[in-house]
Each structure stands twice: as structure tokens, then as C-alpha cells.
A protein has these predicted regions:
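Short glycine/proline- and aromatic-enriched beta-strand/turn motifs that initiate or cap beta-hairpins
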Residues: 1-50, 119
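Short loop/turn motifs that connect adjacent beta-strands in outer-membrane beta-barrel proteins
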Residues: 3-14, 56, 92-106, 152-155, ...
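Residues that define the transmembrane beta-barrel architecture of outer-membrane proteins
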Residues: 13, 37-43, 77-83, 102-104, ...
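Residues on the lipid-exposed face of transmembrane beta-strands in outer-membrane beta-barrel proteins
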Residues: 19-23, 47-51, 85-91, 110-114, ...
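Flexible, solvent-exposed loop segments that connect beta-strands
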Residues: 29-37, 63-80, 118-140, 172-178
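Gram-negative (and chloroplast) outer-membrane scaffold detector with strong preference
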Residues: 55-126
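Predominantly the C-terminal beta-signal and adjacent terminal strand-loop region
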Residues: 59-60, 73-74, 78-80, 151-197
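Extended, charged alpha-helical interaction scaffolds
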Residues: 100-102, 107-157, 162-163
Length: 197
């Protein structure tokens, strides 16, 4: 009987670097002083380093950051960075078979990590000592998303991906209302296949 094809990745094979930028919008407890709800879009920057262990499965260390703006009776803003370990699955290779000449792939992913925010203006409602409210905060980060990957050459891919981050309620410095804070981002950029350089 014919044997199934097995794919192996050496220690130096299939590493990649991703550089991207896009927009994000927080879904916190939000409304302006009149009760109307409006989302603010701000820039987000992204860098990731990872490895494809098989044609189907990869992991990456992903770092993203920027500013977040939202209304909570008054205008709020803060700076943030987030890091996560993402687990990626090439859906086309997994369902349609491996094709090294494929020019388009869909890659769902899920991640675990943490996010840190600082320069929160105005400060939230969480006490930080000496009668002051905290202007920095952090929260665990569970995320999920979908990446569209377009092959430009053996060395470079273009990608566009959307990500939803599920953060603890205290991430925006305000502990009431919805128990989970969300941040939604859309990012585009380039993947450099380091093992081919």
C-alpha cells in the first residue's frame, strides 16, 4: 500500500518575520455625555516572528501596539502594547492538500498573551494608592482572528488580517458594566520568509 506523504521541518527551516500596520477600535464601556455611541479608529503597528512546523501548523510571537480612544461620558485615551503566542492553521493546505505554488491562503489563528496600557487620560475608577486612580493597567489577552495571505514571490507574502482581543474588564481602567473589554483590529503588511534568504 502507498504510504502517506510526511512533511518535516528542520530547526533552521520555515522561519518568517511579519511587519504590518492598520487600525483598531476598542469596544469598552462607552458613550458620550449625551448617551450616543461612537467608535474611534486609531493606528496600530504590528511585528511578529514565527515558524511553520508543518505545511498546516505554525506558531508566532506577535507584538502590537498604538493608542486607543473611546468615550466614557468624556473623551478617553491611552497607549498600549500587547504580546501573544499565536497558533496558526493553513486552512487550504489542511483541507485541500499541500501545494507549494498556491498563491492565496486563509489562515485562522488563536492567541494567548497579555496587554499593558499606560498614560491613561483621564484615569479610570480603580484606586492606585495615595487616593489616586490608576493611569496604568494590564490584563490577560485571549485573541482570535483570520489572516488572508497572498504570495508575491518565494521570499515575500502580503497579508491582511483581522483580530479580536478579549481583555479583562479592568483593561480600560474602569471596572463596571460589560465584564470583557474588546479591541478589534485590521492589519495589513508583509511576511518575509527568512529561511529562503
Amino acid at each position: 500500500m502507498p504510504c502517506a506523504t510526511h512533511y518535516y521541518s528542520g530547526h533552521a527551516d520555515n522561519w518568517f518575520l511579519q511587519l504590518g500596520a492598520g487600525i483598531n477600535s476598542p469596544f469598552f464601556e462607552y458613550s458620550d455625555v449625551n448617551g450616543s455611541k461612537k467608535h474611534h479608529l486609531t493606528a496600530v503597528y504590528d511585528v511578529a516572528f514565527g515558524k511553520w512546523f508543518t505545511p498546516y501548523f505554525a506558531t508566532r510571537m506577535n507584538f502590537m501596539g498604538g493608542t486607543l480612544h473611546w468615550d466614557n461620558a468624556t473623551y478617553h485615551k491611552m497607549n498600549y502594547v500587547a504580546g501573544s503566542v499565536d497558533f496558526m492553521w493553513d486552512m487550504f493546505n489542511g483541507l485541500g492538500g499541500v501545494n507549494t505554488d498556491r498563491v492565496f491562503s486563509i489562515v485562522p489563528f488563536a492567541g494567548l498573551g497579555a496587554a499593558y496600557a499606560w498614560n491613561m487620560q483621564p484615569a479610570g475608577n480603580i484606586a492606585g494608592g495615595k487616593t489616586r486612580h490608576k493611569s496604568t493597567t494590564w490584563a490577560p489577552d485571549i485573541s482570535a482572528g483570520l489572516q488572508l495571505r497572498f504570495r508575491l514571490s518565494r521570499y515575500v507574502d502580503f497579508f491582511a488580517e483581522g483580530r479580536v482581543q478579549f481583555l479583562g474588564d479592568v483593561f480600560n481602567g474602569t471596572a463596571y458594566g460589560v465584564p470583557v473589554d474588546l479591541n478589534i483590529s485590521a492589519i495589513g503588511g508583509f511576511t518575509i520568509n527568512l529561511s529562503l534568504i
